[in-house]
């Protein structure tokens, strides 16, 4: 295992209490481990396209260089006296932009939160870049020479004790792996897979600290704990990877049972483009007659355990997944329907995101990448009616090549209980965590939404995609939408405000983030801004009723799909652990790359309305700026 992110839908709902979800959140993790005190501080810098064009005009290019070589030259010229390595996850996106990622090193040891990302345009020149490289004093001696640091077993004990992890390390032995100073622990219990440790530096408070990065997957938390290499009961920082045929289902666009009835859908992969060449029930080598295929394995998990391979799945040799549901049934009575619905929703979203550029090279979730690059063997494991929790959901995102894992829970806030698998917005929100964690910082690095503001945007992206997809043809910019209202049985939903373009209905601006210490609240602000972006683009370009977008010159022709595409492309451009301002600039730059900036003013109108105006400069305090660019 290597770095991963666990993201959940909401703060925990007290059992039996219907009125206290995310609207009354503290910093406490819904899974019981409060990582907020351990989050990395924000250090990323981002050079947007206009500034980059002015900055690198004198940069030496060679026509013989490929995009990786050009990116490498930029890093070397920017930090000529620093050492770094190229991360093996570079690719060219569907918008023609090449993405290359670098990790800073010291004495051959990774500085785990020191990253440099370079985006190369179609013309072979640097388009944008971002970095969080450490620029302070480097250690004078190589720590591997004296090895005056604790062994990894002590670091494992320290992480378990300090964070109160449910792992028993009494017989732990550190077994060396192929990668230098990397160990797997045998003889432990309580984790879903063997814990691991790797010796890395981190930058904190202006200094480098040598740490053991201890990785523990305990189900609802998949943690990277940075344990001091000498004082092993000191945990400096923590990253959590987890941040929620014929089918009779609620069709795509119906958010929950209040919006329509289940209908019969035949061979939906025929309408969702090239994302599933083996259909949804094959992976190029095996054909399945259950809810499993190249993209998704969907099953129940009533025990809440880590085993999934042999769990129950609906089976039909005729691939006819037709089951009954009505609102008077208990979730257990309609588990076949729920698993089928989960399988349908996640596969459809997979195929939609594929059309936008979340492909094999970009780190998507597939068993067989069909020779198209990236790391395979990492389809998403999707558990319906997971017994490890209630009133929530989560998604664990390890780096490319390791399975994503979704856990969908039942909600006890209504009688009978409700199944989150039937609320598409919750499923889409969770899968979107996999999207953002694979794209931000590159598919090999799942640590790039670990800081508070960046983690908040991870939550906001989930709500944005969930809301954009549920829009109806007769909606207008005056239409408001909530999040989680049906599953939680809570009028107004589980966010502080509904998503609305009306400042009286939802008054959030960027300045409101200043007083927030919890990712879901921050995420609501970000999704609120993106909801304005969405409607500005729909007003300009209309809204298609089709599941899949129509592309003209590489860009979706309608506003809804264009918004979703630009937000996705923006993720690929921004630096590791971005802030709102850098994410805004990345979306503007994504439009520059895709449409030559045709939508700049529509985008900036939305950003400036919510306090991210053109003259905003990120500082210690978040103060609104409502300025528009002079050319708008």
Swiss-Prot record:
The protein's Enzyme Commission number: 3.4.24.-
Cofactor binding comment, as recorded: Binds 1 zinc ion per subunit.
Residues that make up the propeptide removed upon maturation: 20-244
Chief site of localization: secreted
Keywords noted in UniProt: Glycoprotein, Hydrolase, Metal-binding, Metalloprotease, Protease, Secreted, Signal, Virulence, Zinc, Zymogen
GO biological process, one term: proteolysis
Cell compartment(s), UniProt: Secreted
Glycosylation sites noted in the Swiss-Prot or TrEMBL record: 270
Range of residues in the leader sequence: 1-19
MF (Gene Ontology): metalloendopeptidase activity; zinc ion binding
Name recorded for this polypeptide: Extracellular metalloproteinase 2
Species annotation: Trichophyton tonsurans (Scalp ringworm fungus)
């Amino acid at each position: 295992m290597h770095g991963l992110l666990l993201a959940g839908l909401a703060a925990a709902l007290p059992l039996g209490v219907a009125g206290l979800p995310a609207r009354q959140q503290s910093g406490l993790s819904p899974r019981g481990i409060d990582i907020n005190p351990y989050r990395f501080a924000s250090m990323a810098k981002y050079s947007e396209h206009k500034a980059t064009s002015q900055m690198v005009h004198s940069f030496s290019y060679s026509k013989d260089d490929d995009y990786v070589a050009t990116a490498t030259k930029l890093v070397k010229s920017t930090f000529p006296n620093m050492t770094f390595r190229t991360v093996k996850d570079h690719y060219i996106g569907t918008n023609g932009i090449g993405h290359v990622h670098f990790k800073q090193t010291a004495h051959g040891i990774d500085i785990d939160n020191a990253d440099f990302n370079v985006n190369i345009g179609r013309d072979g020149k640097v388009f944008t870049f971002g970095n969080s490289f450490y620029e302070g004093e480097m250690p004078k001696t190589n720590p591997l020479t004296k090895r005056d640091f604790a062994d990894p077993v002590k670091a494992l004990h320290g992480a378990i004790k300090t964070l109160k992890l449910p792992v028993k390390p009494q017989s732990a032995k550190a077994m060396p792996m192929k990668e230098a100073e990397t160990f797997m622990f045998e003889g432990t219990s309580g984790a879903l897979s063997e814990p691991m440790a790797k010796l890395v530096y981190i930058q904190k408070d202006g200094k480098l600290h040598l740490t053991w990065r201890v990785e523990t997957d305990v189900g609802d938390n998949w943690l990277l704990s940075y344990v001091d290499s000498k004082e092993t009961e000191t945990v400096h920082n923590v990253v959590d990877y987890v941040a929620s045929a014929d089918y009779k289902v609620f069709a795509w666009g119906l958010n929950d049972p209040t919006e329509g009835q289940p209908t019969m859908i035949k061979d939906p992969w025929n309408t969702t483009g090239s994302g599933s060449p083996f259909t949804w029930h094959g992976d190029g080598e095996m054909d399945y007659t259950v809810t499993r295929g190249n993209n998704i394995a969907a099953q129940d998990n009533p025990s809440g355990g880590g085993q999934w391979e042999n769990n129950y799945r609906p089976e039909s040799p005729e691939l006819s997944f037709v089951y009954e549901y009505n609102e008077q049934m208990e979730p257990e009575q309609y588990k076949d329907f729920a698993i089928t619905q989960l399988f349908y929703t996640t596969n459809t979203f997979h195929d939609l995101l594929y059309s936008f550029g979340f492909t094999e090279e970009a780190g998507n979730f597939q068993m067989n990448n069909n020779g198209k690059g990236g790391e395979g063997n990492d389809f998403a494991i999707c558990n319906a009616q997971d017994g490890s929790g209630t009133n929530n959901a989560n998604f664990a995102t390890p780096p490319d090549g390791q399975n994503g894992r979704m856990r969908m829970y039942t909600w006890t806030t209504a009688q009978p209980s409700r199944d989150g698998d039937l609320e598409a917005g919750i499923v889409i929100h969770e899968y979107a965590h996999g999207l953002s964690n694979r794209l931000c910082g590159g598919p090999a690095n799942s640590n790039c939404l670990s800081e508070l503001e960046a983690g908040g945007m991870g939550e906001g992206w989930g709500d944005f995609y969930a809301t954009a997809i549920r829009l109806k043809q007769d909606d207008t910019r005056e239409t408001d939408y909530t999040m989680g209202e049906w599953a939680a049985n809570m009028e107004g939903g589980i966010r502080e405000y509904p998503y609305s373009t009306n400042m009286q209905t939802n008054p959030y601006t960027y300045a409101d983030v200043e007083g927030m210490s919890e990712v879901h609240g921050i995420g609501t602000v970000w999704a609120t801004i993106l909801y304005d972006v969405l409607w500005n683009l729909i007003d300009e370009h209309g809204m298609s009723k089709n599941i899949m977008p129509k592309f003209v010159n590489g860009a979706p022709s309608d506003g809804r799909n264009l918004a979703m595409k630009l937000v996705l492309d923006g993720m690929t451009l921004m630096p590791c652990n971005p802030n709102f301002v850098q994410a805004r600039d990345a979306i503007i730059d994504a439009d520059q790359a895709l449409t030559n900036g045709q939508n700049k003013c529509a985008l900036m109108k939305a950003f400036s309305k919510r306090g991210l105006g053109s003259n905003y400069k990120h500082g210690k305090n978040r103060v609104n700026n409502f300025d528009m660019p002079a050319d708008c």
